[in-house]
UniProtKB/Swiss-Prot annotation:
GO terms for cellular component: plasma membrane. This is CASP-like protein 4C1. Residues 1-31, 93-103, 172-186 are cytoplasmic. Pfam families: CASP_dom. The lineage of its organism: Eukaryota, Viridiplantae, Streptophyta, Embryophyta, Tracheophyta. It comes from the Eukaryota.
Amino acid sequence: MRFPQPHRNGGETQQHFHSTISLQKLKRFNSLILVFRFSAFCFSLASAVFMLTNSRGSDSFHWYNFDAFRYVFAANAIVAVYSLFEMTAAVWEISRNATLFPEVCQVWFDFGHDQVFAYLLLSANSTGTEMARTMKDACTDNKPFCVQSDIAIALGFVGFLFLGVSSLFSGFRVVCFIINGSRFYV
């Protein structure tokens, strides 16, 4: 259920008119956000799984022996869980035409968490990239370990791109909420 927002100077609330075309545009916009959130989930989960399964033999390298790779795994796993929650919220919003939380909370929750987790992912994957670059000399003996680490980091960067686009959309919704008193631009 949408809660109408009062005007800033205490006046009456404004009721928004939504035509059938407007509702179709809103569903398309929400579906587009869902696609980007699903993509961020898939790539972050794949990155976490690639890093988690990156161990070769008992005497060679293990991902958990390197702080940077543990950071890559943890950040991608956290973003995968967050993206799963946001996909659930997006499906709820598409199916019921209402947000999971009150509208003001949902708009700021989405935007704030998208920003925090996007920067977390960028930071973790940048740290992992530096570790992988530093290890290039040691990779002559453990080539599969290094290749799988590179793949996990690359998947994490792609997950960051999709989460960044989701953050742009949620930022657009915040601006619409500030201007119109509703998360919709119509």
